Regions:
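Bacterial N-terminal signal peptides
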Residues: 7-15
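Positively charged n-region of N-terminal signal peptides that target proteins for export
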Residues: 1-4, 456, 474-478
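Hydrophobic alpha-helical membrane context
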Residues: 14-15, 218, 468, 478
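A short, hydrophobic C-terminal helix/tail in secreted or cell-surface proteins
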Residues: 455-474
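Sec-dependent signal peptide recognition
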Residues: 2-8, 459-462
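Sequence/structural signature of beta-propeller domains
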Residues: 21-452
Length: 478
């Protein structure tokens, strides 16, 4: 009996010691002073910044299969002061970047188990086949602190050249007679992004509406808009965020709309999360919204902030468990020291629908468990809190790898450098290794998204052409 007990204890000890804790596998970067591949947008914006500056890549981040990822910059470079009537936003054309993440195992003894080399393979501009509403410039004339400002039309010049309607980050591109959920507004502030299971389209959430749009992945043309619950929208619009906040008693707070977006592994349900509480809610209670892609039916659940000042991302573990990125605004880019950059596991399986509720929703909030403290984990690799990016916003699982003989899930986390590389550094990508044992410690499991083996949508067309050519050749041989 004693021998059996000793054997059991030794077995348990070995199992515990061999189980890996979540660790940083690799760190990579893309030059924040570089430009993307959209040469047509290379000209200077209203604020003098190049319209194709390669920045803000971590606002949204999604796996597209293999080593391919999609990154969505937000509404563009608006940190350069030029016109307070539009909160310094410019006619930056919204887009997403297709990236290759080359992850290669290092020799033993290296500080990191892998090396990560990101590269940019494509830039896709986002557009609509139907007309959008742009600011006329008339509403953008006035005086601020004794200085008079004026604006031109908010439509990008590229509209006329390419005979299309591009979405832009400029805050006055809306119809003032309609609410913020009007899908004909040209203003768009992309945040979360996910790739459909067939690999042919992308879903992108936004802060202005909030909206969730589906775009054709090859062309960037909008396919459809999902109608979100009316209580998320505001009825009185303004090109100035502070004015919009002060004039609305309900709806999303300006610049803090649907910050994160997840897609369940089966590709059937979108799960969006707001960055901050709605105007009608209190006690740090913000909302999670699920959308059935086929039926468009929505549900709302509550999430209680505990450490950070807001939420930046959500990604799926399975059909009911998710990881949520909760953070403060401190760190590199803010000139301060990062404190709260934490990833929590949540579970919606027994959550209460709060669609018809408002106020203090904290008692209805989903359960949450701390999974990764990013500041602590990066500190283990010698990265000081002052060098941890202030805006850790993108999060996505990628391909599994083997680490010391253990199958390990890769969790990619990216920063939004606000198009300010001189202050916030380059576009950074952190790869964390997550094992099933790590997930079991917080009562979670992981199911990978069922993405196609061929990640690039253009390849489908090439394959189709190739099949036709092969068929023609076969017929000739006959």
């Amino acid at each position: 009996m004693k021998k059996n007990l000793l054997a059991f204890m030794l077995s348990a000890l070995f199992a515990t010691s061999s189980a890996q804790a979540v660790e940083v596998l690799a760190i990579g970067s893309l030059n924040g002073f570089a430009h993307d591949l959209s040469s047509q947008t290379a000209g200077a914006l209203e604020n003098g910044v190049a319209g194709n500056l390669l920045g803000g890549l971590g606002s949204g981040f999604a796996w597209a299969g293999g080593n391919t990822f999609i990154a969505t910059p937000d509404r563009g470079p608006n940190a350069t002061a030029f016109n307070p009537l539009v909160d310094d936003t410019a006619s930056y054309i919204n887009r997403y970047q297709t990236l290759k993440m080359n992850l290669v195992a290092n020799q033993s003894g290296s500080n990191f188990a892998f090396s990560l080399t990101p590269s940019l393979s494509k830039t896709t501009l986002l557009s609509s086949s139907t007309a959008l509403t742009y600011g006329s410039g008339a509403m953008g004339t006035g005086s601020v602190n004794g200085t008079t400002y004026s604006l031109g039309n908010g439509a990008p010049a590229l509209n006329a050249i390419n005979n299309t309607y591009y979405f832009t980050g400029r805050s006055d591109n809306f119809n003032p007679a309609l609410g913020s959920s009007n899908s004909n507004n040209a203003r768009f502030d992309p945040e979360g992004v996910r790739v459909s299971n067939d690999g042919k389209s992308v879903f992108i959430s936004d802060e202005y509406g909030p909206y969730i749009y589906q775009f054709d992945r090859a062309t960037g043309r909008r396919i459809q808009a999902f109608e979100l619950p009316a209580n998320l929208a505001v009825s009185k619009l303004s090109s100035q965020g502070a004015t919009e906040i002060s004039t609305n008693a309900s709806g999303r707070v300006a610049n803090k709309g649907m910050e994160g977006l997840a897609l369940t592994p089966d590709g059937k349900t979108l799960v969006g999360i707001m960055q901050a509480p709605l105007a009608q809610d209190s006690n740090k209670s913000l909302r999670i919204v699920t959308i059935d892609i086929a039926t468009k039916v929505t549900h709302e659940y509550a999430y209680k902030l505990t450490t950070g000042s807001g939420v930046s991302e959500i990604t799926a573990l399975n059909d009911h468990q998710f990881l949520v990125d909760e953070r403060d605004g401190k760190g590199l880019g803010d000139g301060s020291t990062a404190v709260a950059k934490q990833i929590f596991k949540i579970d919606l399986s027994n959550a209460q629908d709060v669609s018809n509720m408002k106020g203090d929703l904290s008692s209805k909030a989903v359960s949450k468990t701390l999974f990764i403290d990013l500041v602590a984990k990066l500190g283990e690799k010698g990265i000081s809190a002052s060098q941890v990016p202030a805006k850790i916003e993108g999060m996505a699982f990628g391909q599994d790898v083997m680490v010391n003989g253990v199958n390990t899930h890769t969790l990619y986390i990216a920063n939004d450098n606000d198009f300010l590389p001189s202050l916030a550094g380059d576009n950074k990508f952190y790869v964390f290794g997550v094992t099933d044992a790590d997930l079991a410690k917080v009562g979670a499991t992981y199911t990978a998204q069922a993405l196609p083996a061929v990640p690039e949508p253009e390849t489908y067309a090439m394959m189709g052409l190739g099949m036709l050519m092969l068929g023609a050749m076969a017929r000739r041989r006959k």
